[in-house]
Amino acid sequence: MNTNSFYSQKFAVVPMLVFCLTLSIGFAQHPESARGDKSQTFVLADSREVKIATPDNKLLQRELAQVKEKMSKNTPADSQRISYWDAGAPAYRWNQIAYQLTGAQFEVNNGLTFFKSPMTWMNMAIYDATVAAMDIKQQTSRKRPFEIDKSIKTVVAAPATYSYPCEHAVTAGAAATVLAYFFPEIADSLLTLGKGAAESRVAAGVQFPSDVAEGWKLGEQVAAKVIEKSKNHLTVMPWNGKQPSDAKHWRGPYPVGAVATMFKPLVMKSGDQFRPAAPPDFTKEMEQMNNFKQNFYTASQAYYWAAHSGLDIWTDLASSKMFEYHMDRNTLECARIYALMNIGLYEAVIAIMDAKYAYFGIRPDQLNLDHKPLIGYTPPFPGYPSGHAMASSVVATILSRIFPQDEAMFKQLAKECADSRFYAGIHFPTDNNVGLDAGEKLGNYVFATLNKQM
């Protein structure tokens, strides 16, 4: 599989925010499921815990006039914005935005925001808010504007759900609020972006203004609950561990990522639940690396995976499967998939760093001081097990349970990711193999546990 050509277009963080306001992309429309009342949630004891106003039918004619007026003023830029946010499920664009923001944080403040996994908390908020929204849709049974006034011609095909509240506004309120918390330096831009996403649905003729206003409030309320939950899980204290001083273990000026060993898991019983056995002596594997001959393929794989956090590759792949299997208009199911994946990744961060700082597995360039990694650097934390290998294996395993017909492809991609770290000269084979194995166990555990609830 040529993953390099499959995932070619990437965007810088700041341009991405501008891009979100202007790009126009369209996809085929498909009906979506509307029922959320049987789905358990992460932060809501009950989906009815979050309250929004009941639609006021006395204002119906006024709101219809507002929809028509809004549509009459659409500019080409408005049309592009409508098409952009209409692509896929409401969570689709927000996951694209979130992985760009999160991936850029790896080298900022010792990766603290990156390790906190903002995408996990965002997708939990989106999922819970969507469950609540689908319940309220069933309770209110509000028709969409064009169903009441046949003179309204929508710009896009409307979702096959009731109108109130707007699922895009619910998602935008949840996503933008959570991301604004994790990225305070661009909070205003994110909230403005979210408001634009929500309001695009009125301009498209598929929602009433109150659908959007109350939908945003719903998402915002759920986001606040998720943020409070994150504060209880993302404990940040100075790391008090001691580094081994002998030449057989990793050593570094600062233990990057060690803070994640103090995070509270969402699914695992403890951070060491999937800790692998201690690593072997790497002397023989160092000889294997010294004798390894690069070729075009191995070098390209090394650079490809080194250039990405993995969040982008796996998120894009999951999204493409949702489109491929015509799930992209099932708002709740797509929210569920994104949540499953990203909770798996959050658990992986904790498990990976637990093992790394339990064993201080040495890196090749520390075992052999003459060794030069192909990609020009070595990550600033212990090597065993490989984080890329384990995290990719977790996601590959979860996606294999959701899309079993594609299991071979997911597993092959995870192996390519793992192998690339050896090609890059920064991981021994055991780092990668153990990472793949531990990731599969963790992925199966996360899916089996959460699938009973969601």
Residue ranges and their predicted role:
Residues 14-24:
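Bacterial N-terminal signal peptides
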Residues 8-10, 20, 255:
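Compositionally biased, intrinsically disordered low-complexity regions enriched in proline and serine
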Residues 2-15:
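Bacterial N-terminal signal peptides that target proteins for export
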Residues 27-454:
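Acidic/polar surface patches and capping/hinge elements
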